[in-house]
């Protein structure tokens, strides 16, 4: 099963006319990809920071959408995960989720990060293009979600810790039990 992981572009400069040219891959996505790979899933990473830094700085949102569509066509994933580290990236994350759904209406979209962790119910209530929200650390959550989708078993969603979703009737369900990863040291 294939999972496309997306890190949105983050301009860390106050002066938006100044752009960094030394972005590194998203550590969060690398951790998620490692967990997926260790559990026999096929992750593909799209770090839009690197895509934007090297081209189309002035029209980044449209360029990012183009990169996402190309990645969907190339990867043909079963699940798309989008990192939303900062609240400032949330509007773009919603645009990217909408881009995914416009391209592939049945594609499942999960988001995670600090902003979604703080507002899972509000996001699922107001954002029809987001299907799932990882709450807190997402490494175990993404693996459990991928397994549920692979098995085509929605009942498994209720067992995923630190996770929010809409059930088959559209009701929002939030599993608040904490899901900590093992110490990395």
Predicted features along the sequence, with ranges:
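Short catalytic helix/loop segments, enriched in acidic residues and glycine
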Residues: 21-36
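Short secondary-structure boundary micro-motifs
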Residues: 18-19, 28, 148-150
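Hydrophobic beta-strand segments of well-ordered beta-sheets in folded domains
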Residues: 1-4, 79
């Amino acid at each position: 099963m294939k999972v496309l992981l997306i890190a949105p572009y983050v301009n860390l400069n106050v002066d938006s006319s100044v752009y960094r040219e030394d972005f590194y891959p998203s550590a969060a996505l690398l951790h998620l990809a490692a967990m997926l790979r260790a559990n026999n899933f096929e992750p593909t990473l799209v770090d839009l920071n690197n895509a934007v830094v090297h081209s189309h700085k002035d029209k980044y949102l449209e360029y990012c959408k183009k990169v996402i569509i190309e990645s969907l066509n190339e990867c043909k994933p079963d699940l798309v995960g989008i990192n939303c580290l900062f609240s400032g990236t949330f509007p773009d994350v919603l645009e990217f989720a909408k881009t995914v759904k416009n391209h592939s209406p049945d594609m499942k979209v999960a988001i995670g990060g600090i902003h979604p962790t703080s507002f899972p119910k509000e996001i699922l209530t107001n954002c029809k293009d987001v299907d799932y929200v990882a709450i807190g650390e997402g490494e175990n959550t993404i693996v459990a979600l991928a397994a549920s989708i692979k098995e085509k078993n929605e009942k498994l969603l209720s067992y995923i810790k630190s996770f929010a979703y809409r059930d088959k009737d559209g009701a929002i369900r939030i599993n608040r039990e904490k899901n900590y990863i093992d110490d990395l040291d």
